[in-house]
Regions:
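Extended, histidine- and acidic-residue-enriched regions that form the cofactor-binding/catalytic faces
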Residues: 1-94, 100-214
Length: 214
């Protein structure tokens, strides 16, 4: 790519996490989702896709095996520095996060970007009520990416009433010993492809958003 072309290009940055997703999905589920959405967008728009940022703020999963979490402060600071380093090469960054726990960190990144004059946008998957973690949504998307990623025989339902408030107070382990918040039993690859098409369209809308005049 010629250097002079880079100044008006958009960079998609997949942001994930490394945390439990029940017994049936991999620890890298959120990173796979974010990377898949970015790659889907790259098939319909001329954008660049950065290597995935595979860790995030996942303190709510404390106590489950395999957790690697940076926390909100470190995640935000790392991504602020990423924006600063990218500004000479790309005129717009779109962070595509597969993990809802990154919301506060990315909100901080956007706030700093606005002050410093950078064009930074953020996208998160739309969640279905009662299906926030390792349920039908994420399981379907991973089935559409590669069925070998999903151990369907291990999928279990777990969505206690009022789980959102409880999770914020006590963490996921206190309300769901399996780590699942949702029902993966109805997951299908076709459903995953439908979700991906919708999510791709949402990110494309961000890519196509009119730019501020510098």
């Amino acid at each position: 790519m010629e250097q002079q072309q880079r100044g008006r290009r958009t960079l998609l940055v997949p942001v994930g996490s490394f945390e439990q997703h029940g017994s049936h999905l991999p620890l890298t589920t959120d990173t796979i989702v974010a990377t898949t959405v970015c790659n889907d967008v790259a098939t319909v728009r001329d954008v660049d896709v950065a290597p995935a940022f595979p860790y995030g703020a996942s303190g709510e999963h404390e106590g489950f095996w395999g957790l690697l979490s940076l926390g909100t402060d470190a995640t935000a600071q790392a991504l602020v520095e990423l924006v600063r380093s990218a500004r000479a090469s790309w005129s717009r960054l779109v962070f595509v996060s597969g993990h809802g726990g990154n919301f506060e960190a990315l909100h901080r990144v956007v706030t700093v970007a606005q002050v410093e004059g950078d064009d930074v946008l953020v996208w998160f998957p739309t969640d279905h009520e009662g299906d926030a973690h390792a349920g039908v949504t994420e399981t379907s998307v991973l089935l559409s990416v590669d069925p070998a990623l999903v151990r369907e025989e291990r999928a279990v339902f777990a969505a206690p009433e009022g789980w959102m408030a409880q999770a914020r107070r006590s963490g996921v382990r206190a309300i769901s010993p399996t780590g699942v918040l949702g029902d993966p039993s109805d997951a299908t690859a076709e459903r995953g492809r439908t979700l991906r098409a919708r999510w791709c369209g949402e990110v494309v809308a961000l890519v196509d958003r009119p730019r501020r005049e510098s």
